[in-house]
Structures are given as C-alpha cells and as structure tokens.
Amino acid sequence: MKIHKLCFLALLLAHTTSAVNLNLNLKTSELVFLGDAELGPASDGVSRSGALSMTRDENPFSHGQSLWSTPVPFKPSSNSSSPYPFETSFTFSISTRIKPAPGHGLAFVVVPSIESDGPGPAGYLGIFNKTNNGNPKNHIFAVEFDVFQDKGFGDINDNHVGININSVTSVVAEKAGYWVQTGIGKMKHWSFKEFKLSNGERYKAWIEYRNSKVTVTLAPETVKKPKKPLIVAHLDLSKVFLQNMYPGFSGAMGRGVERHDIWSWTFQNSAKRI
C-alpha cells in the first residue's frame, strides 16, 4: 500500500510533553495518505473539493487512511496508566450511489503507526483485516460512522455510530442522530432526532475522552453542539494507547460507490501529568 505525503489544510501543531493542539483551517500543511485517501476531487472532476476523501469512486472496494504525519503523545510514558484527556471535532459527509448497495462508512482513528498492516475494505472500514481483527496488540481506538449493516460484525443497523477498540465490532453503538431539549422550566424534556448518515449532508462530530469516559456527540453541521451526547461509555484506554500515537481518519466501501469526506478537523490533547 502506497503512502502519500501531500500539502493540504493547515494543521498547526503546538507540542509540549503534555499538550498537543491540532487545528485544520483549510490552508496548507502535511498529512500522510495511505491507500486510496486523497485530497478529494470537486464535482467537476477536475478541481479539488478542499475535503479529505478516504475512498475513490472509480475503485471498487476502495479504502484509505489519512493520518497526522508526526506522532502525538497520548500518555506521559509507555507504562503510564493515565492517558492524556483529549477532544476532537470534525465535519464530514458520506455520499452514496444506490446501486449496487453502498457502504460501508468512515471512522476517526487513533493508530500506533503510519505503516499500515494491510487494512481491509468493506466492513473492515480501512482499519482492520481478517487476520488482525480483535487482536489486543492492535492498539487501535476508533469511532465509526457505519452505513452498512454487517451482522457478522454485530452491527445494530445500517445507520449507526460505534466505539471500537482493537476490533471492527463495536463495544457500544447507537443509531445515528442527536438529542434536542424542548419545553420550558419543569416541562423540559429530551427528544431524539435521527438522521441518515449517508444522505450527503454535512454533520459534525465531537469526541472527548477524560477520566476513563468517552463521549460522542453528533449533529447537523449548522446545529450547535447538543448538551446531551449520543454515546457515553466508561472505557479504560490505558492499555490501548501507546505513549505516542497517530490520530486521523479511515474509510472504506464495498462494491457500491460511496464518498467519505472530511471537511474540517480540530484535535486537542491537553493534560497534566498524574
């Protein structure tokens, strides 16, 4: 699998031993592209859209990754049991063509290296493969945005968000959507609004990890961050994260054509040593 380095959107790196800030502001910088990932083409097929694209229309079973090109500290030391808290947000879209059945989805990933160990297409989401799926030595954390139900991987439906640790099978998953609070005073209540991830619209995701708790919040791009997360999961990632890791994105499709685009991205890792 080829590794491409490409000047892309400005991810500004402010780095100390205990803090990292990445900001993507649609200008210039360097990412690492693996597989079919690229700076995506615009609808005219000639110019570039300004988005990171994980898959290519012309390649059946296309899959790829785009990662930050330098290692980011996720723990104070290799044997630390206290990973740094982190938060990331990004805007994405998934666009499909109906025939054949589209799939499969994209994911925010944190991986131990940029040397890919043969990630697979389709349900493996460009992260895992048949051989390494489920291996605790993978040291991979991911949040998937899955638009194809693969019952063999335990998918709850064809439109869900899940947290994955070393496996394409999610440890927790919820149908895609967001929470809205309505009413006044004591009459306030939460209502859930479901939406289709693969309708081509842009959505924004917020992922946070602190005190062994992962929260995932999702909403349409034009909606402010909901106060109630879509997913709250108590997970100890101290055995998953190595001292240095590479954050980024992956995506994969099957026979059907599907675009997986990232339009903006911020990442912050800021923590005191414990």
UniProtKB/Swiss-Prot annotation:
It holds the Pfam family Lectin_legB. Induction: Strongly induced locally by salicylic acid (SA). Completely dependent on NPR1 for early up-regulation by SA. Up-regulated upon avirulent pathogen infection via an SA-mediated pathway. Up-regulated locally and systematically during systemic acquired resistance (SAR). The local induction is independent of EDS1 while the systemic transcriptional regulation is EDS1-dependent. It is found in: Secreted, Extracellular space, Apoplast; Cell membrane. GO terms for cellular component: apoplast; plasma membrane. The modification Phosphoserine is found at residue 238. The keyword Lipid biosynthesis does not apply. Residues 28-268 are annotated as: Legume-lectin like. Residues 1-19 form the signal peptide. Residues 62-81 are annotated as: Disordered. Expressed in seedlings and leaves of adult plants. One of its GO terms (biological process) is response to bacterium. GO terms for molecular function: carbohydrate binding; kinase activity. Glycans are attached at residue 129. Belongs to the leguminous lectin family. Plays a positive role in the effector-triggered immunity (ETI) response. Involved in salicylic acid (SA)-mediated processes occurring in ETI response, but is not involved in the autophagy process. Promotes systemic rather than local immunity. Essential for systemic acquired resistance (SAR), but not necessary for immune signaling downstream of SA. May act in parallel with SA. This is Lectin-like protein. The gene is LLP.
